[in-house]
């Protein structure tokens, strides 16, 4: 069995965020926020949402620029009402460098 809190979905040398979180504020979306860690102006955030019970995941490998410190992930499948495991990572614009992923915990999607 997979232990979601121990799983790495990204591995690399870019700095992770110092603080990070995710909340579901509207139907079928998660809003990610983060702060801290060194970065280059065009580094991007990567979002991953995993519904372990149904074996379904969705991700965006270049969601928004890291410097914005916030981004909304609209899910393409109906995750409404489901409990999901949430991960955040960062990637350089040229995709050559990544951070280790950070497990942000479980969320119930509105």
What are these regions (language model features)?
Residues 26-40:
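Conserved aromatic anchor
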Residues 2-5, 94-110:
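Extracellular fibronectin type III
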Residues 64-71:
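Short, solvent-exposed loop/turn segments in extracellular or other extracytoplasmic domains
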Residues 37-54, 82-84:
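Solvent-exposed loop/turn segments flanking beta-strands in beta-repeat/beta-sandwich domains
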Residues 32-34, 47, 88:
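An aromatic-rich alpha-helical recognition segment common to small helix-rich domains
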Residues 1-26:
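N-terminal "mature-chain" segments and other terminal, solvent-exposed stretches
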Residues 73-100:
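Beta-strand-rich modules
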Residues 53-62:
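Surface-exposed loop/edge segments in extracytoplasmic proteins
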């Amino acid at each position: 069995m997979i232990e979601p809190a121990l799983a790495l979905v990204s591995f690399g040398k870019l700095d992770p965020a110092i603080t990070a979180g995710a909340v579901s504020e509207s139907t079928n979306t998660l809003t990610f926020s983060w702060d801290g860690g060194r970065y280059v102006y065009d580094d991007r955030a990567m979002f991953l949402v995993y519904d372990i019970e149904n074996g379904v995941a969705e991700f965006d490998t270049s969601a928004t620029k890291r410097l914005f410190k916030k981004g909304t992930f609209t899910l393409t499948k109906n995750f409404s009402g489901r409990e999901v495991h949430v991960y955040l990572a960062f990637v350089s614009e040229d995709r050559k460098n990544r951070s280790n992923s950070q497990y942000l915990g479980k969320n119930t999607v509105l």
